[in-house]
């Protein structure tokens, strides 16, 4: 037998979120919401996971997706010339992790973890409304691919 495999899906899809804008109930789902108190609200976010454990080895992969959304702020001519639009693209990233547990005796062990976040170095979508025309920190991480190594000693 290969081991134990677990598959998972955690998803949310907002159908509607109305707030008062100038006295009128307005649905703000799928918008960046630069001109009201609501935060940016993509319609859908999800995480797909796959984990495999076999003896001292375990591995996991996570696919993270944020749907596209848009800003209602008009794009200036200078911003449009730089390629900005009202659209904020969707983003999909993959995180990978591998663990190996070294057993020293019946009570002590050492776990080695190797990880990669954003394994394919996906760039965040640009947002015209964001500070300095950058990105939306509520839904996107601009740091690119990150590699990690961890050790955990249990005694």
Where are these regions (language model features)?
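Residues that define the transmembrane beta-barrel architecture of outer-membrane proteins
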Residues: 42-46, 90-94, 108, 143-147
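Extracellular loop and loop/strand-boundary signature of outer-membrane beta-barrel proteins
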Residues: 30-37, 80-86, 134-139
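Membrane-embedded beta-strands of outer-membrane beta-barrel proteins
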Residues: 48-50, 96-98, 149-151
């Amino acid at each position: 037998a290969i081991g134990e495999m677990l598959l998972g899906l955690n998803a949310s899809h907002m159908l509607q979120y109305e707030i008062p804008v100038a006295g009128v109930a307005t649905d703000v789902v799928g918008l960046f919401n630069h001109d009201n108190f609501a935060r940016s609200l993509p319609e859908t976010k999800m995480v797909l996971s796959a984990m495999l454990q076999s003896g001292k080895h375990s591995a996991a992969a996570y696919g993270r997706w944020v749907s596209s959304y848009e800003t209602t702020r008009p794009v200036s001519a200078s911003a449009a010339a730089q390629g900005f639009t009202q659209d904020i693209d969707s983003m999909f990233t993959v995180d990978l992790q591998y663990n190996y547990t070294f057993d020293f005796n019946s009570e002590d062990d050492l776990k080695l973890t190797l990880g990669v976040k954003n394994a394919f170095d996906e760039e965040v979508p640009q947002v015209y409304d964001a500070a300095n025309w950058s990105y939306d920190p509520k839904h996107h991480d601009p740091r690119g691919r990150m590699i990690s190594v961890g050790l955990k000693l249990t005694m």
